[in-house]
Amino acid sequence: MSAIASVVDPCLKSVLLATDFSEASQNPLRHALGIARHYGAKIYLAHVVSSLGFTLAGADALNGATEAAKRDAHHLETRLVESGALAGLHHEFIIGQGAVWEVLNRIIKQEQVDLIVNGTHGRRGLRKVLLGSVAEQIFRYADCMVFTVGPGSYQEARADEILPNRTFLFATDFTEASLHALPYAISYANQFGAKLVLLHVLPTAPNPKSLLYTAALQGLKEVTRNSTLKVKPEFVVELCPTGPISEKILETAEQLKVDLIIMGLCRSRHVEASSHVPWGTAYEVVCGAGCPVVTVRQ
């Protein structure tokens, strides 16, 4: 395990928000506007009229729904302009037709989007919360960073605001994919004046004075040895001998009242890999977190 030698500066130039114009989309909208304003980035507000539901209804019905979406976009833009929310922001509304993720992915590539804000209503399944289908596709397949405001995210304050006593949580298992997100976590903490808590969960129950526990704690300190964190970080090793590791991460996040969680994801191009491995833990955290979660693809 080597120390992180430098810190990246994620200079975001473009932010994408996928919206359905519903009341539930207002919180992700506030986050997206705040992030774009902080970085001076262009914000794209996109709505895709899914062609899936209009297969039998025909092209006229699809075009009618698209025109209605354009009117909704115009009303939203008018409201945001009148409130001053768009003042000084370079912005663009995009209305598309087709398979939702395919259209969004095309926008990401064409506009070189650096971060997509992923809002979701979510739904409850057996013993867990699930993201909606489009939100899940964004989480699993987007090449850019994904800022997910999950179904359990209750925070009113935006994670992008510079406020005193902010806390960001970086959860790592020390894999290459996980540590790929660390420089971004350090940069975000510095950007927003937050304390960064580095967390590792041991899936065993060693004594806190054992070599395994000590090595994990030392590992957290080592990866930040050459960093330039403005606020002194905190290092936490939790034990999870039973149950999912995600539950311990969520429990720690709640106890510390964190404002943002940052995690790394490995890259996969295979749809078959989208079930639960290797991103099961991150997916469960996104679904259950009471704050937004940023995931960074390796």
List where the protein language model places each region.
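Gly/Ser-rich helix-loop-strand patches that form or flank binding pockets
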Residues: 1-6, 11, 38, 105-157, ...
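A short acidic, glycine-rich active-site loop
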Residues: 62-75, 211
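Short glycine-rich, flexible loops that bind phosphorylated cofactors or substrates
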Residues: 24, 124-125, 177, 245, ...
